[in-house]
């Protein structure tokens, strides 16, 4: 999955090549985005290369090309409306349909067992996650500040995962909601890695 800045850079490369017939230099990229140095521009190009959306040719100026054929790894991942207690992504019969995603562009492996959760409520609006969105999650151990789908004391919720003095708790991205401190159990069911927002035509 590309960051907002990486997507802006990729779009700039495409437009520049279409209009100028060549790729921009690192100096062109630096000036366009206001980077402090050409080294910063190169760092962003390397990030795009690591994610497989461009290729750089060694020893050549303006040596950025788009792969003629992108290797795609498109799969259907299950959508869960309300995650049932104890669910796993190995039980697609509990799902509410599927989303078709290219895992390569998101930096995911099928082994991570990605799945989608349809958002309900307004507790995560501060993270720009609104009702009707689909959050894409993978099954792995969370790191502090990750947004997670968690089963806490028998109920499932989407919140930010935090740790204080070794004690994990969950925090909404909306000041109207209190922190959630587990009384008995806290099971992380997935860590958010992306978001899909359906277009409603408005």
Swiss-Prot record:
Residues carrying the site annotation Cleavage: 85-86
Source organism of the structure: Verrucomicrobium spinosum (strain ATCC 43997 / DSM 4136 / JCM 18804 / IFAM 1439)
Function: Binds the consensus sequence 5'-TGTTC-N(4)-GAACA-3'; some genes have a tandem consensus sequence, at high concentrations their binding is cooperative. Binds to the promoters of a number of genes, including dinB, imuA, lexA, recA, recQ, splB and uvrA. Represses a number of genes involved in the response to DNA damage (SOS response). In the presence of single-stranded DNA, RecA interacts with LexA causing an autocatalytic cleavage which disrupts the DNA-binding part of LexA, leading to derepression of the SOS regulon and eventually DNA repair.
Active site: 123, 159
Keywords tagged on the record: Autocatalytic cleavage, DNA damage, DNA repair, DNA replication, DNA-binding, Hydrolase, Repressor, SOS response, Transcription, Transcription regulation
Quaternary structure annotation from Swiss-Prot or TrEMBL: Homodimer.
NAD recorded as keyword: no
InterPro entries, alphabetized: LexA (IPR006200), LexA-like (IPR039418), LexA/Signal_pep-like_sf (IPR036286), LexA_DNA-bd_dom (IPR006199), LexA_repressor (IPR050077), Peptidase_S24_LexA (IPR006197), Peptidase_S24_S26A/B/C (IPR015927), WH-like_DNA-bd_sf (IPR036388)
Gene3D superfamilies cross-referenced by the UniProt entry: Umud Fragment, subunit A, Winged helix-like DNA-binding domain superfamily/Winged helix DNA-binding domain
Gene: lexA
Family classification: Belongs to the peptidase S24 family.
GO biological process: DNA repair; DNA replication; negative regulation of DNA-templated transcription; proteolysis; SOS response
UniProt protein name: LexA repressor
E.C. number: 3.4.21.88
Gene Ontology molecular function, alphabetical: DNA binding; serine-type endopeptidase activity
């Amino acid at each position: 999955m590309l960051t907002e800045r990486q997507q802006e850079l990729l779009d700039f490369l495409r437009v520049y090549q279409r209009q100028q017939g060549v790729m921009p230099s690192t100096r062109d990229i630096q000036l366009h985005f206001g980077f402090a140095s050409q080294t910063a521009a190169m760092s962003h190009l390397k990030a795009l290369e690591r994610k497989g959306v461009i290729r750089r040719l060694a020893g050549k100026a303006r040596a950025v090309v788009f792969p003629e054929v992108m290797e795609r790894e498109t799969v259907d991942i299950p959508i869960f409306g309300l995650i049932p207690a104890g669910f796993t992504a190995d039980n697609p019969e509990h799902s509410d349909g599927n989303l078709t995603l290219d895992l390569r562009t998101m930096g995911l492996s099928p082994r991570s067992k990605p799945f989608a959760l349809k958002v309900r409520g307004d507790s995560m609006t501060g993270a720009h996650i609104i009702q009707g969105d689909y959050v894409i999650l993978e099954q792995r151990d969370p790191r502090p500040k990750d947004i997670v789908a968690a089963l806490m004391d028998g109920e499932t919720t989407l919140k930010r995962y935090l740790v204080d003095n070794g004690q994990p708790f969950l925090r909404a991205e909306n000041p109207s909601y209190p922190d959630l401190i587990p009384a008995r159990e806290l099971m992380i069911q997935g860590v958010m890695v992306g978001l899909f927002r359906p277009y409603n035509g408005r």
